[in-house]
Amino acid sequence: MTNRRNFISSLTRVAAGVALLASGLSAHAADTIKVGILHSLSGTMAISETSLKDVALMTIDEINAKGGVLGKKLEPVIVDPASNWPLFAEKARQLIANDHVVAIFGCWTSVSRKSVLPVVKELNGLLYYPVQYEGEELEKNVFYTGAAPNQQAIPAVEYLMSKDGGAAKRFVLLGTDYVYPRTTNKILRAFLHSKGVKDEDIKELYTPFGHADYQTIVADIKKFSAGGKTAVISTINGDSNVPFYKELGNAGLKATDVPVVAFSV
């Protein structure tokens, strides 16, 4: 938690400083520096994104208690895109054009980021994106603060294949059906092939956002694991994580039997 708070604190200072330099006298005339908080507080992603909102607000309070940035207090402007991807774009436009925030801290899923991207490019805004992503994108208006697959997913799989990690020979690539899981799993499949893992030892499964019934999928995982030491790489997002792990428990699948590495809890 401390590292995350310090990280957001440093990003907030950078965003405010850049914005003040860029906007000149109009920024100095304001009593506060506005920053946008664009995280889902309702819908399927709220279980993940609400905590990011809370940490951002806590950090802003800490910065303000120490005098703010360049003598000005940070003023958070909070909106709820409600796990609705087009609404992310609408709320981003509102924050930049109407609320005049100097930067936005927001999004979780890559689909929400890609929805916001055209808006921040058009209005020359700044988006600080807080979590891992699939790579294959680089925009000057976005700070990608999370890990790409070569920094997170591949090292995790390498560990699972090692003796210390359990020497997994078979892999279930399980994710929510959108760009980040599919791209990450494409990269992982190629990596596994390079390590001699055959297609018949890789099982790739996807569910929609908000999916709640994992009985069949967990039964498939249990059956698949009978063919050799198996690990699950989960890119399930949002509140679907809850029924997935509950079903693992119901099926009697323990981490010692089938370990699960998750990137989007």
Residues covered by each model-derived region:
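N-terminal export leaders
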Residues: 4-14
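Extracellular/periplasmic Venus flytrap/periplasmic-binding protein
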Residues: 90, 141-251
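Signal peptide-proximal N-terminal region
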Residues: 30, 54-76, 166, 194-199
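Short beta-strand segments enriched in small/hydrophobic residues
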Residues: 32-49, 107-108, 170-176
